[in-house]
Every structure is written in C-alpha cells, then in structure tokens.
C-alpha cells in the first residue's frame, strides 16, 4: 500500500468576467484512510491577486506552492512567466522532478495548469480541474457553463466540486471557494 498523504480535486473557472477556484478538504493517507477533512488546498497569494490550488502529495504540493510564490515575487506578479519558470525548474531539478503534485494558478486574465513534466497549459474554455475527482468536476463545470451561463463563476465552481464529491471517494464536501 502506498503510504503518502494525498490531497485531491481542484476546480477553477473564468466566467462572465469573474474567476473562482474551489477545492475540497480531504487528505487521504495511502489508499484507505482519511486523515483530514478540512485541508485548505486553495489560497489567495501575491497580495490577493492570484489564486492557487494543488492536488497530489501534500508535502510536494507545499514545496511547489512556496516555489511558485517566490517566482511571483521575483517576476512582479507575472503569472505566465512565474508558471513557466517553476515548470522549468521542476522538470530540470533532480530533487524537484520527483515531486508528485499539480498546480492550478489563475489571475483575472489567465488560468494555467502547471505540471511536473514541464507543462504549462492554458485551457481554451477557461476551465481546469485536477486531482482524483478532476474529471467529474471538469465535466460538471463545462456542462454548467454551457447550459446555465447565468450562474456565477463561484456557483459553477461550488457545484462542480459538489458533483465530484458525490462521485469520487477521495473528494469530500468540505469546500473552500475563493474568487477574484
């Protein structure tokens, strides 16, 4: 049995000029034990102008969070440049390369997925989701954005995570939703 702490399911959306990111609170030890129900995996950083969320190994995610925050400071809040620099360092550093986590970062203009393989991806539709319940949240969010455009970014983010929590055993209903 794998004995690491994992944190899962983050959803982010740009919709009708607003942005929101939601994450659940569950931290799982290995594949069988829920160790925490109220982890905070979505945060406002860089003077409240950037939202960041993580999924994956908790310790690894915190390491990446710190590196990303440092890059934001270094590049005066330039989200894209900071994400690219973190991805380059993550991929090329022998120690960082072993980190098992993913980040979603966003500001009012950009929404980016940052992965350990050096990927920095900006979605065409303004929606991203990661973690074990990510595909469920992504499907729910896309359907809501398309079929219920009157909903706010926050409402879509919350509903997408609630749907993922109803389906995925590694996602709970203790949600944090942040907006810009």
Swiss-Prot record:
Record field: catalytic activity: ATP-dependent cleavage of peptide bonds with broad specificity
Enzyme Commission designation: 3.4.25.2
Domain of life assignment: Bacteria
Keywords, alphabetical: Allosteric enzyme, Cytoplasm, Hydrolase, Metal-binding, Protease, Sodium, Threonine protease
Function, in words: Protease subunit of a proteasome-like degradation complex believed to be a general protein degrading machinery.
Single Gene Ontology BP annotation: proteolysis involved in protein catabolic process
Xref: InterPro entries: ATP-dep_Prtase_HsIV_su, Ntn_hydrolases_N, Proteasome_sua/b, Proteasome_suB-type
Record-annotated active site: 8
Binding residues for Na(+): 165, 168, 171
Cellular component annotations (GO), alphabetically ordered: HslUV protease complex; proteasome core complex
UniProt name for this protein: ATP-dependent protease subunit HslV
Oligomeric form and interacting partners: A double ring-shaped homohexamer of HslV is capped on each side by a ring-shaped HslU homohexamer. The assembly of the HslU/HslV complex is dependent on binding of ATP.
